Amino acid sequence: MRHQHGLFMLALLAFLFVITVLGTDSGKKEKQEKKVKKSDCGEWQWSVCVPTSGDCGLGTREGTRSGKECKQTIKTQKCKIPCNWKKQFGAECKYQFQEWGDCDPDTGLKTRSGSLKRALHNAECQKTVTLSKPCGKVTKPKLQESKKKKKEGKNKEKLLD
C-alpha cells in the first residue's frame, strides 16, 4: 500500500511539473506579443499645462501619441503650475537666477540672468534668460542716522526746557 501511495505521489508531482513548465512557456509567448503591441505605440507628447483658473495652480494638459495598434492615443492629465515660477519664460521652465546686478544709471534698470534648472514634460525652454527691473530708491543709511540724532537732540532740548 505504501509503495502504491509513493508511486501515486511521484506521478502527481511529475504531472504538476509538466503542467507548470507548459503553462509558463505559453504565458511567455503571450507577454512577448503584448510587448510588441506596446512598442508599436509612439511616445506621449504633452501640451503645456493650462490652469483651471488664473495663471497658476491646478490645471490639465493633453497628451497624444501615434500607432496603429494603440488602444489609447489621446488622454488628459492633471498638472500644477507653481505660483512662484517666472511665467514669462514658460510655466514649464524653471530657472536658477543670479543676484541682481548694479543699477545702470543710463537706463535706470538692474538686470540678472538665469540658467535653465528644469524643464517639465519635455518643454522647449531657453538655456539662459535675462530679467530687468527698475532700480529702487537708493537709501542712504547715514542720512537716516543723522535724522535720528536730530530728533534725539530735539527731545533732549524739550526735556531741558
From Swiss-Prot:
Region (Disordered): 136-161
Compartments in which it is found: Secreted
PROSITE patterns: PTN_MK_1 (PS00619), PTN_MK_2 (PS00620)
Primary location class: secreted
Molecular-function GO terms, alphabetical: chondroitin sulfate binding; growth factor activity; heparin binding
Region feature (Chondroitin sulfate A binding): 141-161
Domain of life of the native organism: Eukaryota
Entry keywords, A to Z: Antibiotic, Antimicrobial, Developmental protein, Disulfide bond, Growth factor, Heparin-binding, Mitogen, Secreted, Signal
Signal peptide location: 1-23
Disulfide bridge map: 41-70, 49-79, 56-83, 93-125, 103-135
Expression tissues: Expressed in high levels in brain and eye. Lower levels in bone. In the tailbud embryo stage, it is expressed exclusively in the central nervous system, especially in the hind region of the brain.
Single GO BP term: response to bacterium
Pfam families in alphabetical order: PTN_MK_C, PTN_MK_N
One cellular-component annotation, GO: extracellular space
InterPro entries per record: Midkine_heparin-bd_GF (IPR000762), PTN/MK_C_dom (IPR020090), PTN/MK_C_dom_sf (IPR038130), PTN/MK_diS_sf (IPR020091), PTN/MK_N_dom (IPR020089), PTN/MK_N_dom_sf (IPR037122), PTN_MK_heparin-bd_GF_CS (IPR020092)
Region (Chondroitin sulfate binding): 86-93, 117-125
Family that this chain belongs to: Belongs to the pleiotrophin family.
Function noted in UniProt: Secreted growth factor that mediates its signal through cell-surface proteoglycan and non-proteoglycan receptors. Binds cell-surface proteoglycan receptor via their chondroitin sulfate (CS) groups. Thereby regulates many processes like cell proliferation, cell survival, cell growth, cell differentiation and cell migration. Has antibacterial activity against both Gram-positive and Gram-negative bacteria.
Protein name per the record: Pleiotrophin-A
Gene of this entry: ptn-a
